[in-house]
Amino acid sequence: MNKLYTYRLFFLFFIFLSNQSIANDYKIAFGSCLDQELPQPIWKTIEGEDVDSFIFLGDNVYGDSMDGKLNKMKLAYKKQKKMIPSWLKEKDLFYIWDDHDYGVNDGGSEYKYRKEAQQLYLDFWNSKKDDKRRSQEGTYFNSIINIDDLKLNIIGLDTRYFRSSTKNRQDGYEPLDKENITMLGKDQWTWLYDALSNEADLIILLSSVQVLPTNHQFEKWEIFPNERVKLLNALGNIKTKTIILSGDRHRAGVYEYGDIVEITSSSLNKAIADSWYEKLILNLMPKSIRKKLIDPKEQDEFQINELISEVNYGLMTIDSINRTVLIEIKDISGKPIQSYLKEI
């Protein structure tokens, strides 16, 4: 065997090993709060990540509609369809909704056009005709992804369709702990217990509103403390490790409760007080509320590091060989701001 042939063979073998190493990493980007009326330069950065999947965590359009024709929602979807880059449509997409693509700010089961909004939502995402969400009430779903020898159980919750009405006060939402108060509704809870029992190495739970934080005045699971405890107990009673992804807040952060980690990523293009009219509204608010809205030093007992108020996205890199998940929150340029490494 001549030397030239040997060198070529070694080179091809090296390339093969390199490709095998790359193939063992599965990348999932995620984010929330995507305003169709604003520029979306962040997609260019995310394209460079060469992700396998993207998870939309709610407020994927801003189309609040209080009339039965849902004209504002239809227009919002029409505009957003033009904004979503073509390369993204070739990836595996997972999506849940929050209040602004549900149809009403901070809305729940009292929204009388929720059935119509659900069909518009599914049409926008080109959900297949046999998608269970086409025939069920609510947009919750369960999907299994196999990555080499790893099995991911992606569970998307609907925190709007069945949710009991809330009571808003000047200092935030009043906690409601009556027995009939619900976040998910009876049918979705039954389904969730079943979804959690699926054999998997890692659960990725999608909730549009935050699960772990308790100390801020905005929407969160803690508004229904019994429901939050119920969810944490359900997650604590299974052996599979869980990562919660959430949005809504127009800020990003990392939270930890025992073996459960929650990553909040928000917003993709709508940072807090980014426009002149939002700044005007903030200036008209009481100082105490304004400070809580824009102060990145908000603290919570489960919070790790300071919150991020600039435009951001999340990136989850799953290493099936070393059985680890690296979760990063990145800015619009792709620079990591915070990271969290979790063993599977």
Regions found by a protein language model. Give the residues of each.
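Sec-dependent signal peptide recognition
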Residues: 3-12
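Metal-dependent phosphoester/phosphodiester hydrolase catalytic core
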Residues: 23-344
